[in-house]
Each structure stands twice: as structure tokens, then as C-alpha cells.
Amino acid sequence: MKSRLLWCDILRVIATIMVISIHTISVYQYTYIKPLQLLPYSIFGVLNSLNRMAVPAFFMLTGALTLKQTKKPITRKSYTYFIKNIIYRLVIPFIIFSLAVYLLTNQHHWSVTGFLALFLNYPGVQKHMWFMYVIIMIYFFIPFLGRFVQSLSRHELKLLICLIFIFSNILSELFILSKHYHKMVFNEVALPYIIAYTNLVLLGLYFMKYNISPGKRRLIYMLGIISLILLPIIQALTNNVDVAKDLITGRSVLPVFISSAGFIFIKYHFSKVKLSSCVTKVITRLSEISFYTYLIHVTIIDIFYTYLLNHNRLNTWTDQLIWTPTQIVVVFIVSSIIAYLFDKLYRYLTKKSSALITRHQPAKQLGNSS
């Protein structure tokens, strides 16, 4: 059995909770951006910024855990095996959850064409599922990325990451802001968004592979804290929900600093943490099912949010603030339970189907001489 890095599991669980927090708090934050109501917007804005390391952290963990050192060449057999794993672990569950969410949220308008029209187009059946299209696409290139980055020195990898950040994240953000203020610059100049997210994968590898000196860690922490403060302020200055949302993606600037600070903090403060076997087991299990938790959590948020609205629990911003922690906890627990049950069922069915296929294969294919 492969040894696990507990701090990576801790980071993944924290990122999962943060994603739930983002989709819970954002509804309230953007309610007060236009017209701007400073106090409630500031409170929800700061809380939302605190969680902005979540999605970039998922990409960074992908790089940290998959771009491993290997001298083995990429063969047709090895790549086929890798693709089968992607289909089993990512694609099939993604299709199942997308179909389930579609059936739950479109109870009176079911149709195959309706589902395909959503599923085969970005961002998918629900807006948060954009992540799946990007991460699956990146995964197809992971073996090649791994071979490529092995040929780079630490300095070369750092330079590559910085260049992509400049020509993707910075130019993209300048375009977004200039467009909002009708002074358009860098239109269609920035690198495609898929490159920006791939850069987060490379950044995760860099932070995992190389030691970051205490001085540089403090600098990154400072950039993260400054970004936490600046993000809601810049969003408020735009006074536009669409622009505000564009400024918090992993292809903009400030969330990268926030996620880098969070990633490094957890790596260096939790890498030697000692927890009881029971707590470790729970964290590991929550980490293993976090992918399924991510897929279902928005549906649970919508159900609970609708319930609170119907029972007049969210009439004022103070009501919303009071109920926010409860929403996050309830959604995380319910989503995790559903994810756990799905994982058990999915493992059972795939094991049974695999055994059935093996049983019906010719003896020669199984390596038998008879």
C-alpha cells in the first residue's frame, strides 16, 4: 500500500469545506455589491476571500501528487492504463453525478437531448462543474507534463511558472478590468485559461518538490494576506457582479497568492502533525471521497437555501450571517454522507463487473496454458 501524505489529505478536506463556503457565502456577498451596502458586503467579502485558495489548491495538489519523478518511457500500454484510470475515477462518476443532478433539478423537463445539451457544453449541468472539464483535460496530459518537467532545473521551472503567470493571469486580469472601465487592453492576448490552470499544477509540483526558505515563506504569507484584503475591495470598486466573479477565478491574480500561502502554510505546519489513528482515518476517508462531495454539494446547498428562504430565516444580512456556519456544516455532512455511500456502491459495482468480465475472458487471455 502506498504511503499517504496526511497534510495533503488535510489540505484536500479543508479545500472541500472552503468550496462549500464559497458557494454558500457568494450568494449573500453579491446581493450587497450593487447597490453597494458596505458593512454586509465587507463582512461576506472577507469571509469569501478567506476561502479562495480552495479550487487552486485542488489543481496544485494534482501537480504535487501526480507529476512524480519517473524514468519509465510513456508506452501505448502504460498510457492506455492511465486513461482507463481517468475514465474509472473521474469520467464515469462525473457522468453519473451530472445525470443525477439533472434529474433532480429538472424534474418536469427531462429529455436526453436536454441533458446532452448541458453536459456536452461548458460549464456543464451546474456551474461548479466547470472544474471537471478543466481537470479531466489536464489529466490527459499529466504523463507528458511529468516527462517534460523532469528535464527542467529548479530555476527553469520557477521561470516557466512566472512567465505563464505574467502572460496568462496578469494579462487576463488587466483585460477584465480595462474592459469594465471601457479602456480595453490586451484583448485576446493572454494565454488560454487552460494554460493558467495547468500552471497551478506546475506550481503545486514546485512547492512539493523544493524546499521554500523561511524568508520566502514569510513573503508569500504577506502576499496572501494582502490579497485577502484587496480582493473584496477591488470587487466592490467594480460595482459589477460579473466582473467581481471574474476576479476570483484561478486564472486571475490574487487567488493564486492566497492559495500559494495556504498551500505552503499547511505543508510546513501539518507535515509533521501527529493525530490519533481514528482522526487520521476519518480525514483520509473524507479526502478520498472529496471528489464526489464536490460534485453533489451545490445541489445540497440549493435545497437547504430554499428551505431557509421558505421558512423566512434569511430576511436580513444578520440572519444570513448567523445561518452561514450552519449551512456550511450541514451541507458538508450531508454531501460527505452521499459521497461515502456512492463510493461504497461504485467500488462494489465496479469490482463485480470486473470479476464478471474476467470470468468470461478466454483462458489464453488470462495467461493459462490450458
Language model region names:
Residues L6-Q69, L90-S98:
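Functionally critical transmembrane alpha-helices in membrane proteins and complexes, commonly lining
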Residues I17, S21-T24, L99, L103, ...:
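Aromatic-anchored segments of alpha-helical transmembrane domains
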Residues Y139-F167, Y206-G224:
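Solvent-exposed interhelical
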Residues I195, I212-R285, I289-Y292, T299, ...:
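Alpha-helical transmembrane segments and terminal signal-anchor/GPI-anchor hydrophobic tails
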